[in-house]
Amino acid sequence: EINQLYRTLLQDVPGIAFHTNPNEDFDSNYWLTCIVVNADVTGFTREEVRLRMEQENIETRPLWKPMHLQPVFADCPYYGDNTEGRLFDDGLCLPSGPALTNEDIARVATIIKEMY
């Protein structure tokens, strides 16, 4: 319900993409709503969105930092194409708690839209 409302409110916002199921074999419960901010399209970065939300006393966070980028794993081999690095750089977890109201979600969406 939370995820769907975010998707509805931000569906026409250029440069904001939501994580989706890759195909019908997957069925996410969307316990956490995450977006990817394409700064080339939006004109602002994920970090700018996070800081703007912080100014409004709204907690968001980047997607999880990839294991191979954490200091404890600095000397470990890495096999990949940096997709996870791009998601960490551009991805943001939006407020998704069960106590959120529709008005709370609308406020988050409005703040993102006002950044344009």
Description of each model-found segment:
Residues 1-116:
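PLP-dependent aminotransferase class I/II
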